[in-house]
Amino acid sequence: MASRARMERNYRGLSHIDYVHKKMWVVQAVCFGIAVLVFFGTLVAASINLTEGFPCFFAAVVDYRTVNTTLVHTGLTYPRLGGVVPVLFFQTKAVVFFFYATSIVFVFLVCYITVGAIISSKKHVGAAYMGSGAFVFSLMASPLTILLGTVSIWLLQAVVIVLAHKLIVLAAAVYLVHFSTITFFYGYFCGRGVDSKVYAEDISSAKDIDGSLHKLIGNVRAMMVNLLSIVYSIILIMSSLMFGMLLANSFTLKFWHVIVTVLITTSVLTLIYLLVIEFLIARYVHIILGAYIGLLIGYGMLWTTTCDYVNRFYYAMGANASNLRIACHSVLAVFTVLILLAMVVRLIRASLYHRRRSTRAYAKAMKLQQNVKHRLRQLRRSYKQRGSQSEDERALTQSRSAEASDEDTIYDRVYSGSESEWDD
């Protein structure tokens, strides 16, 4: 009896601890969801031209069509012309795409966490993870991850508000802080702060507890990591432009200094990011194409922006105009090819890993390949049968026409008037 009472007390204590962990996690998740919704609402409010509200459109950071020659500390000074050249930055459409794409991905993250909370609330899931309530919720997102995500989205909202008031230097500084926080958020969300072997074992153990939980922390989580990687890649490239914006509006620089700074910063961050993806994050999510897709999108945006910028302000470059233009195209082209090669290497290594381990994903891929080959064979056979049938029909038609021509030839022979001669 005493042992049974002790077990009941332990059970109640564990259930109470799990209840507290669940409530704390739910509060953090709700705060994260509210922050994301408020950020999306701020974007919409800052995009609408109203008499009351934000003074300016937040995405109109630079306008290359007009050059301001009165202000001195809002751009790059060009001594020979006595004017001011706008700083290299994404134009309005690219800025709108970046912020709204980020908000949409974070809305998906909120939906993912919400579904995870519903699945974790099942009785058999709670019974299986009795005494480790914090662990079951960390399978979706740990409390630290949610906290970093909330701070990151709040800082990005502050960037939107500051941009709407045209405080460019403050916006760049806040964005760089946002970049540092979302980097930690991205790392914790991808790996949960555990070793890759532990990560795989946790996913595998969830298969015997609940199938929906296993799919959520396995396949669905991998999809969310890929979506977040797309956005983070563009965030990384945007950080180099914000860094150039901060330098250009804080110090006296020449025209080409900011362009070179942006290219060098982007190149260094891209190299570090590719190495981290290949040797660290790929241990958790093997097929992580989102990072490369995001980099290609970001480099495409940067390439078009840089080309337009250099073409518009060609006069301000002086004798180094052609060299700077060639350097911009060369650096961006080399890194675009490097990103494509890294993506091919990742695909090859992922396929070799799944083939060596004979995983379910590899089995599904092989089954899909066999189905495609079978369908192609069926199409070829049907095409050959149709071809043979058409040839038979053509031959039959030709034979019938030949017989008809012979009959016509016979009936065309008429009597010429004599008994021995027939005229055609």
From Swiss-Prot:
Primary localisation category: virion
Pfam families: Herpes_glycop (PF01528)
GO CC list: host cell endosome membrane; host cell Golgi apparatus; host cell nuclear inner membrane; membrane; viral envelope; virion membrane
Record carries keyword Transmembrane helix: yes
Topological relation to the membrane, as annotated: Multi-pass membrane protein
Transmembrane segments: 24-44, 95-115, 144-164, 167-187, 227-247, 262-282, 284-304, 328-348
Side of membrane Intravirion, spans: 1-23, 116-143, 188-226, 283, 349-424
Virion surface side: 45-94, 165-166, 248-261, 305-327
Alphabetic keyword roster: Disulfide bond, Glycoprotein, Host endosome, Host Golgi apparatus, Host membrane, Host nucleus, Membrane, Transmembrane, Transmembrane helix, Viral envelope protein, Virion
Cell compartments where the protein resides: Virion membrane; Host Golgi apparatus, Host trans-Golgi network; Host endosome membrane; Host nucleus inner membrane
Region (Disordered): 382-424
Record-linked InterPro entries: Herpes_glycop_M (IPR000785)
UniProt keyword Lipid biosynthesis present: no
General function of this protein: Envelope glycoprotein important for virion assembly and egress. Plays a role in the correct incorporation of gH-gL into virion membrane. Directs the glycoprotein N (gN) to the host trans-Golgi network.
Record-stated family: Belongs to the herpesviridae glycoprotein M family.
Assembly: Interacts (via N-terminus) with gN (via N-terminus). The gM-gN heterodimer forms the gCII complex.
UniProt protein name: Envelope glycoprotein M
Native source species: Gallid herpesvirus 2 (strain Chicken/Md5/ATCC VR-987)
Gene: gM
